Amino acid sequence: MSVHLSGAGLPAAVDVVVIGSGASGMATAVTAAFHGAQVVVLEKADKFGGTTARSGGWLWIPGMPLATALGIDEPAGAARDYIAHEATTHFDAARTQAFLENGGRAVEFPPRHTQVQFDMPRSFPDYHAEARGGQAGGRSMVTRPYDGRELGQAIAHLAPALPELMVLGMMLASGDEIRHFTRAFRSLASFRYVAARLLRQARDVLRHGRGITLTNGNALAARLARSALDLDVPIHLRCR
């Protein structure tokens, strides 16, 4: 993969043209390239990653293998009931069934064949866990933190996370890292962790101009981009 700063130099013919470099587009590009297609990604912005890179980037998919590994059961019909409750008059039974039947299978591919790896906090509840079909955990997962140096020079073109999602310019991982920051002045272990994290952030900014410990949606966008790089998928920016 190479990142191009314009639409110049596009190949004359490809098998798949992907419009947009968020998670959906890049996952499509990586999957198609993995199966032998010649792919090109076109992005209108001057950075790749789309909304995914700027967001939390969590996935909500019931019945995932990660949940099973944690010993969390998915009651029969509960996810369908929850979606119906949340969607109200917009509920689509056929689409919901397709999502529930294929969602778990879809997320088995990235950890096996790409740089994308997921973690699942045991106690991350549905937004309305008390609603019909809601669960206290086992449906939400997040991309494992990623070292931005693995992207090489391409990290300069990765869209940053929203400032509202950062602390002192740092993207914090969910779970233990957030707990350390909230307990920094109540726990010596947390204070040491936060101090080391701040020093690492300062070093990264001096060396690379930005923090390179990538988390949440930024980590997902970066891992997908690294996977595309490995498969020689070009990304063209500023394509309008």
Predicted regions and their residues:
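Extreme N-terminal leader/targeting segments of oxidoreductases
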Residues: M1-V16, F34, A222
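A conserved short coil-to-beta-strand element within the FAD-binding core of flavoproteins
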Residues: L237-R240
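Conserved N-terminal/central alpha/beta ligand/cofactor-binding core
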Residues: V3-L5, K44-P234
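Short coil/turn connectors at secondary-structure junctions
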Residues: A12-V14, H35-Q38, S55-G56, L231
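Short linear motifs at secondary-structure transitions and domain/linker junctions
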Residues: V14-D15, F34-A37, G209-G211, N218
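N-terminal Rossmann-like FAD-binding beta1-loop-alpha1 element of flavoenzymes
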Residues: V16-V41
